[in-house]
Amino acid sequence: MSYTVIYAGTFDPMTNGHLDIIERASELFGQVIVAVAKNPSKQPLFSLEERTALVRQSCAHLANVQAVGFSGLLADFAKQHQAKALVRGIRGSDDIEYEIRLAQLNDKLSGRLDTVFLPPSVTWRYLSSTMVREIYRHQGDVAQFVPNAVLCALKEKE
């Protein structure tokens, strides 16, 4: 069976850890929709359109991956795209309790939506968008942490 799954996040900015999860999900599932979320409670570094374009560029080598910007409930977005499951990255024990509650909530809201947890490769386990933003704001080199498209976009912001 060829399933559609959704990997959602704000991706502000997209990191190599995100790309690792997307690449691995693309090997496991027929179609991966990267749902780039508009989160009104956050002040993003990049606009929704920019973040969606950066995910698209970073995933151009993956034929079964598409990036779509969205706002609203993820469970509703999943229904609209007939997704069978959500893919979530789990970096460590700090993430597990929150992610399990979120998975249960999305399942309840959608009627039936499973969540598949993928730990990132050991290389990227410590990495987060927040860390990348902090390094960037302090003029640090983020080249090893982000896809090339993101690095170019960050340099254009300087």
UniProtKB/Swiss-Prot annotation:
Keywords: ATP-binding, Coenzyme A biosynthesis, Cytoplasm, Magnesium, Nucleotide-binding, Nucleotidyltransferase, Transferase. This is Phosphopantetheine adenylyltransferase. HAMAP family: PPAT_bact. It is found in: Cytoplasm. GO terms for cellular component: cytoplasm. ATP binds at residues 10-11, 18, 89-91, 99, 124-130. Its cofactor is Mg(2+). Belongs to the bacterial CoaD family. It comes from the Bacteria. Its EC number is 2.7.7.3. It catalyses: (R)-4'-phosphopantetheine + ATP + H(+) = 3'-dephospho-CoA + diphosphate. Substrate binds at residues 10, 42, 74, 88. The gene is coaD. Homohexamer. It is an enzyme of class 2 (transferase). One of its GO terms (molecular function) is ATP binding. Reversibly transfers an adenylyl group from ATP to 4'-phosphopantetheine, yielding dephospho-CoA (dPCoA) and pyrophosphate. Pathway: Cofactor biosynthesis; coenzyme A biosynthesis; CoA from (R)-pantothenate: step 4/5. GO terms for biological process: coenzyme A biosynthetic process. Pfam families: CTP_transf_like. Disulfide bonds: none annotated. The record marks 18 as: Transition state stabilizer. It comes from Actinobacillus pleuropneumoniae serotype 7 (strain AP76). Its main location: cytoplasm.
